[in-house]
């Protein structure tokens, strides 16, 4: 249990890798651009959708029959969305998350939904998360709760999990204009502290060292040691042995 899908978009490829090791790789549709990711670090890329025909589609109904669920991702909107029902991430007729209108985020399922009257700040990266369990839905923006409600329950559909539109609010269409980064899906309900850590950058869904990023020649995540996770440039602690 835990992370069941993670797309950091650092590979800049027509097939974007799922780093959760579940093999749910995404197919990049249209001609999206690759831009700097939310962290600003070298090698951190994001995907920029044009709002016309760009999307990322998978071949799996990832969100079926989940008693608990967490969706976590970053978005950047260059301008306010035009029109309604702009899909961000989800699975048509099961779990649909997007902009129901230009200023309202919506998490919708056949078992219940929540509308949150806020919009991400234009031209700034915003971390968005939804946590679902037996108590209901909680929506976060930049680590802060912006909406919550009771209800809900496991849902399912025959559609596939997609990002950026094209099978989220409807079978096709409803494309999102903007950039997206670090999409993660969990089959557990993350805690408020977990969400705050993702939003602050103190945590990432998993270490990215399993993926070769263009230009990256060394990486020290400090996960209990000071080893270079992708090479042999291991560090040596000076003055302390407290590596947590």
What is the predicted role of each segment?
Residues 4, 16, 29, 50-106, ...:
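Extracellular glycan-recognition modules
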Residues 9-36, 192-197, 221-244:
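Short, tryptophan-glycine- and acidic/Ser/Thr-enriched carbohydrate-recognition patches
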Residues 38-53:
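Short carbohydrate-recognition loop motifs
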Residues 105-127:
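Short, aromatic/His-centered strand-loop micro-motif at the edge of beta-sheets
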Residues 124-138:
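Localized edge beta-strand/strand-to-loop motifs within extracellular or lumenal beta-rich domains
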Residues 149-179:
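Flexible glycan-contacting loops in extracellular carbohydrate-active proteins
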């Amino acid at each position: 249990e835990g992370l069941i899908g993670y797309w950091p978009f650092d590979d800049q490829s027509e097939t974007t890798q799922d780093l959760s090791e579940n093999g749910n790789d995404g197919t990049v549709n249209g001609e999206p651009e690759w831009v700097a990711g939310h962290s600003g670090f070298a090698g951190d890329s994001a995907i920029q959708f044009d709002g016309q025909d760009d999307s990322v589609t998978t071949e799996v109904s990832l969100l079926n029959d989940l008693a608990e669920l967490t969706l976590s991702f970053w978005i950047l909107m260059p301008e306010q969305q035009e029109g309604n029902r702009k899909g961000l991430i989800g699975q048509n007729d099961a779990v649909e998350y997007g902009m129901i209108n230009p200023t309202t985020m919506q998490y919708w399922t056949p078992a219940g939904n929540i509308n949150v009257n806020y919009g991400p700040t234009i031209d700034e990266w915003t971390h968005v998360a939804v946590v679902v369990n037996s108590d209901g839905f909680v929506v976060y923006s930049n680590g802060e709760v912006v909406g919550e409600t009771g209800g809900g329950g496991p849902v399912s559909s025959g559609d596939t999990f997609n990002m950026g539109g094209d099978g989220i609010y409807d079978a096709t269409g409803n494309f999102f204009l903007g950039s997206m980064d670090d999409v993660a899906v969990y089959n557990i309900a993350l805690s408020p502290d977990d969400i705050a850590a993702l939003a602050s950058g103190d945590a990432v869904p998993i270490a990215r060292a399993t993926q070769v990023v263009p230009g990256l020649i060394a990486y020290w995540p400090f996960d209990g040691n000071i080893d270079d996770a992708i090479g042999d440039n291991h560090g040596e602690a000076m003055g302390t042995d407290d590596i947590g």
